[in-house]
Structures are given as structure tokens and as C-alpha cells.
């Protein structure tokens, strides 16, 4: 009887210790929530849906431990991640040429552009690709009943402006072998969670153009004009003739840029420039093309609507 009683005590003690061990493991193991991400595309009307969307979940207690999910075609989908409080940023991932900075911080995450040397050796920035996105400051994924799904709705909006331009009054366009254009007083970066421009940044953007009949035309995307007060917007046109001679023309277009109403930093602009200039035919010291130095230069094709 004593031996049986001792055996029973040992068995109950072992069960109790085992139960405690499993309970501790349960507390240490994170519970996962099922989240259905829905994209509402009603705010995008001037562009096709992107190749895909990237959604970044930032835990409020540890921003460095992000959870990142891709949604091809910008289609809805379900994901699982640990129960926690999050902040969320989404953006299209077909953004070749974009430089992402501070992506480990919700408040500092920035879309930036690469530096480039202009034909007259000035430091400028390339223009960004098309960008859309959304953000949510608070998503609570805690105490979700087992078997249920939390729905998160993201509404991407356009995050870049579309600038187009036309240059008139230039004679001898048949002598132009290459051309570039630039616009000063612009912003080369964008804060993603605030959808806002840096307050202290003013850069010149470098972009392409083309000869079309008796005009030079072009278009590009930009985050918008600089938020700095009093920064002029000067349009510079670089022309190189077939003999290698370079001409640089410039015109202040600040009024045209700032006369367009903006929503936040977004406002599409069409610039009209009128010159009285003839492209020279005499030879220059260089070749007929520009040597633009930029890391991983990517051509961005933009539809031009005039």
C-alpha cells in the first residue's frame, strides 16, 4: 500500500511539472493572427495597376522586426503574423531606380533618387519612377478570436506628380544629336508615412526629352517642387549638335510651377518655354552624345499628353 501511494504521488507530481512546462511554452510562443489585406484602387484613375504591392508591418514595440509581404498584381490576399500592435506602409514594388532609405523606421522611411552629374558637371538627381502607396498609423492585432480573420483595407494614392514640357522657338533642330533637360527647386525624396517632402531639401532634376517636329517635348515624374520658400524653378536645356558643340539655354518657370494648385505635394504641371535660338552647326570639342554619369541608370518611359 505504501509503495502504491508513493507511486501515485510521483505520477501526479510528474503530471503537474509537465503541465507547467507546456504552459510556459504556450506563453513564450507567439500567437499568430490571420489578416486579409484588401486594396481599394478607387483613388488611382490616371495609371494602370502596378506589377505588385509591398506591405510592411512595423511592430510598435520593435520597429526593426518588420514583417514584409508582397501582393502580385495588387490583388487582395491573406497573411499571418504575430499578434501585436502595428503601423503599416504599402507601396508598389515595380520601382526600378528608387533608393529606399531608413526602411527600418515607420516615421523615417524615405523614397529617394540617385545622384547624377549633368552635362555641365553639376550635381543633380534622377527623376523617380511612378509611385503609389498608403499608410495606417494604428493596426491592433490582439485578442482575435480563433478562426476569425482581421481585415485591413489599404487605399493606394498617387505619390508623384507628372510634369510635361514643350520648348518652342528653336531653329535647326535637325542638327540636334542629343539633349537633356533639368529643373531646379525640386524635391528628390519623399517621406512615406507622412506622404510629405523634406522641409530643407532643394535639388535639380535631370531628365530626357525628344525632338518632335518643330518642338522639343518631354515628361517625367517628380515628388514635387521644393518646400523651401523662395527657391526658383529654373528650366535648363542642354543641346548637343552633331559636331559635338553643346548649347545651354535656361528660363525661370517658377510662376508656371507654383500657379498649379497642389493637394499636399501633388500637382501635375505642363511647362511651356519659348526661346529664340538657332542650334549652331560649327564643330565642338566633344562627341555628339552626352556622357551622363549615374549608377544603375534606368530609362523611365512616360506617356506625354499635350
Q: Which positions does each model-derived feature cover?
A:
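Tryptophan-paired
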Residues: 54-102, 177-258
